[in-house]
Each structure stands twice: as structure tokens, then as C-alpha cells.
Amino acid sequence: MIKVKPLLFHGLFGLVLKSYIALIIAFNFMNGKDTVSESIIPDLKVKLLNGSSTTLHQLTQDGPLLIDFWATWCVPCKKVMKFLDEYHEKYAKENFKVLMINTDTPRSLAKVKSFIRSQKYSFNIGMDPNKVIAKKLNGMIMPTLILVDKGGVVKWRHQGYVAGEEIEIEEQIKQVLGKNINEKNKG
């Protein structure tokens, strides 16, 4: 009698299939399970670059918050920052805030401070050198943007940045602000 080995998990095809399955599992795990639309963002403590601390819920008490995970080595992160700073200033009267959470190592703190100083950004800078917040909010792919409304509800999530996407980012901000403005007009 001849034994026939199932070819499904053997050889190159098996390796490719196993890799594909692993990627699907990893993607589903990393795909923002704590920050899916309409979920409440966890109230995580954030250490700010200026040495003070705050929480995500404190930052959303007065208005919406856009969280962005970034690193000094991330070119797309640096490109989107100028737009996020512009939106931070443009919509400040509506209590909109931007929190840029840096994930560089503790050794890079001086580099982070120098970069922010040189750019004269006005948004809040959080530090997450051990990537605790990034892992909890599934922000390990950079940049990851998470837009949260005044109540702490995640309204939009986006990973990556290419030129032109700043238009979509601002549209999402306007949508969340429109809801908050309508709530103010009712009261």
C-alpha cells in the first residue's frame, strides 16, 4: 500500500499557506480591537513631553481628540504632523485637541524634544517609550490616527499616510466637530 502525504501543509506551498494564516491572525489581533468605531477609548494615563501627566478621558472632557502615534524615524509621521498641528490650531475654539504619542526609545528623548522645538508645534506630545499605550490602542503601525469625540467614543481610525489624505483627516474632524456644535446648540 502506498502512503500519500497530504500536500496542503508541506513544502513551499505549506510554508506560504501557514504564513498567510499567521498574517491574517496577526492583522485581526492588531486591527484596533480596543479602538473600533463606536467603542469607548480606555482611560489610559499619558506622560507628556513637558513632564506633566494626563489621561485620555481628561483630554476628551471639553471636546474631541485626535491621537496620532509617531516616531522620529517615521517619514510619513513627520509629513502628516504639519497638517495635524494646523488642525489643532484651526479648531482650538471648538475645544479640538491633537495628542501626538511618540514611541521612540527613552534614549531618543533629547532627539524628540529637539525635533518638536525646531518645528514649533503647538499640539500635545505624549511619550510612550515602552509602547504600552501603542499596544493597548493598537497603534504599532505608524502613523496611526484615532479620532475620539467629546464623550470618549472612537469615531474614526486610520493607519498610514500618503499625500492628499490630510483632506480626509480634516473632513473626519469636521464631522465630529459638527456633532459637538449641534449638541451645544441644543443646550
Give residue ranges: language-model regions.
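Conserved redox-active cysteine motifs that mediate thiol-disulfide chemistry
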Residues: F69-E86
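Thiol-/selenol-based redox modules, centered on thioredoxin-like
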Residues: L147-G187
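A short beta-strand-turn-helix
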Residues: K45-P64
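Thiol-based oxidoreductase modules, predominantly thioredoxin-like and allied folds used
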Residues: N95-L109, Y121-N130
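N-terminal targeting signals for export/organelle localization
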Residues: M1-K47, W156-H158, N185-G187
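Short, internal strand/loop/helix patches
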Residues: F115-K150
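Conserved helix-turn-beta segment immediately C-terminal to the redox Cys motif
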Residues: G63-P64, M81-N102, R117
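Short pre-active-site segment immediately N-terminal to redox-active cysteine/selenocysteine motifs
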Residues: G63-L65, F69-W73, I141
